[in-house]
Curated annotation (Swiss-Prot):
Residues 91-104 have a biased composition (Polar residues). Residues 113-374 form the NR LBD domain. Its main location: nucleus. Keywords: DNA-binding, Metal-binding, Nucleus, Receptor, Transcription, Transcription regulation, Zinc, Zinc-finger. Orphan nuclear receptor. Belongs to the nuclear hormone receptor family. One of its GO terms (cellular component) is nucleus. This is Nuclear hormone receptor family member nhr-28. The keyword Mitochondrion does not apply.
Length: 435
């Protein structure tokens, strides 16, 4: 009697026998062997709750590897197999491998879902990965390899505004590449949508990184540095250059804003454990807003079409991938975040306006205009050109193309890169600001 092979204990596909201590298919066995042999360190963007099945097994490598371990696969079996072919350099004392605990910039597993129900969300995810790698170069103010680990630092307002100024064009590039319909919109309508989007995105992304790192006492910046909310003097301090307001008065006036951001955005996102696809959904709903002053009917209709599409995709994600028992309630809890986000945006706008009126500290004109609802006429002619010197552009080309195939617009195995170059500040890390 012929006995059929058992299914893979990781993904449920037809098995190929016992591998490393558990029943597994060839794909999962090869994945486990490669992960252990190359000492891979994966990070899940969905709080370790991804479903691993044969049609979505490649979606999250972190959860796939965790499941390999939970079903009984042994790292030691891979190690013994490797030693048959030559002893590895096991000198732990020399050149230790740094394992960063932060989730930013994120090492993202390329999405490979066979069912075509999340086209826009997948596109956003891939382009966000690309943007994260470009950020490593754009915001690299030091010397040496951009993938070498560096300790994040608490920054002052001048550094934070410099980061956000670089982000204006970079985020616009992400939007243009991710939404084909955005290119079809009239120039003035593009500016209208984007200036309504950038500040909410900036705050949303900060909440998303706080959610990933499970802490809300600091505000993560796209550069990998942070604003230390518990020590506002590192952000304002003695750098206030105003005759109308002392540094102490500035701290008393603006520190309550940190509490507003935390209460309205950071804590709710952390409580709901918002993952990457939910973050992209919120971004999409903010971008494709309607009822804006000056918005024409054609733009309104296109915005409605894109909102409906992204809502269908997130519901598909809830039902088919996450397999949430009550997708409607989960989506409702997600949408409740949007009014609170707008309260934080208004507070940020008020703070910037106060600093401008009282000349508390200088704000770059481009950033102030965006906060005030203005963009230059030629913004989208130059937005896709990254704000970088020719030398930086060469570095971007050298470092980024190794993980992004410009011909196919697909991620090329990000996990062949060294570990991410940023470390999460710990409670014991002194919050020093480099000036």
């Amino acid at each position: 009697m012929i006995i059929g092979k058992k299914p893979c204990s990781v993904c449920g596909e037809a098995g190929d026998g016992a591998h490393f201590g558990a029943e597994a298919c060839r794909a999962c066995a090869a994945f486990f062997r490669r992960s252990v042999a190359l000492n891979k360190a994966y990070v899940c963007r969905a709080m370790g709750a991804c479903i691993i099945q044969k049609n979505v097994r490649c979606m999250c490598r972190a959860c796939r590897f965790s499941k390999c371990m939970s079903v009984g696969m042994r790292k030691s079996a891979v190690q013994r197999h490797r030693e048959l072919f030559g002893r590895q350099d096991s000198s732990d004392g020399s050149n230790p491998r740094v394992s960063p605990s932060t989730s930013w910039p994120m090492d993202v597993s390329p999405v490979n879902i066979e069912e075509p129900g999340m086209a826009t969300l997948n596109c956003l995810n891939e382009n966000y990965t690309h943007m994260s790698n470009v950020r490593r170069v754009i915001h690299n103010t030091g010397s040496g390899n951009i993938f070498n680990p560096r300790e994040p630092k608490a920054v002052a307002y001048t550094d934070a505004h410099s980061v956000h100024l670089k982000e204006i064009g970079l985020v616009a590039d992400w939007i243009i590449k991710s939404y084909p319909d955005f290119q079809k919109v009239h120039q003035e309508q593009k500016k209208l949508l984007y200036r309504n989007f950038f500040l909410p995105f900036m705050i949303l992304e900060c909440g998303y990184h706080c959610c990933l790192n499970d802490r809300t006492d600091i505000l993560f910046l796209p550069s990998g540095d942070f604003i230390d909310c518990s020590r506002p003097e590192t952000f304002y301090g003695s750098h206030i250059n105003s005759h109308l307001m002392s540094p102490e008065e500035a701290i008393r006036m603006f520190v309550p804003s940190f509490e507003i951001y935390r209460r309205n955005v950071l804590d709710p996102m952390r409580r709901e454990k918002v993952d990457n696809y939910e973050f992209f959904t919120l971004c999409s709903l903010v971008l494709w807003d309607h009822g804006l002053e000056g918005q024409i009917d054609e733009c309104v209709n296109m915005a409605r079409h894109n909102r409906e599409r992204i809502l269908r995709e997130i519901l598909y994600y809830y039902r088919r991938v996450k397999q949430i028992p009550d997708p409607s309630m989960r989506l409702a809890n997600l949408l409740v975040l949007l009014p609170a986000l707008q309260r934080s945006v208004r507070r940020f706008q008020e703070d910037v306006e106060i600093t401008h009126v009282f000349n508390v500290y200088s704000v770059e004109e481009t950033f102030y205009e965006l906060v005030s609802g203005r963009l230059s006429d030629g913004f989208f002619q130059k937005a896709t050109q990254l704000d970088a010197t020719p030398e930086e552009m060469k570095e971007i080309k050298k470092e980024v193309e190794c993980v992004w195939d410009l011909n196919t617009s697909q991620v090329v195995d990000l996990y062949d890169l060294p570990p991410t170059s940023f470390l999460t500040p710990t409670s014991s890390t002194p919050s020093s600001t480099e000036m």
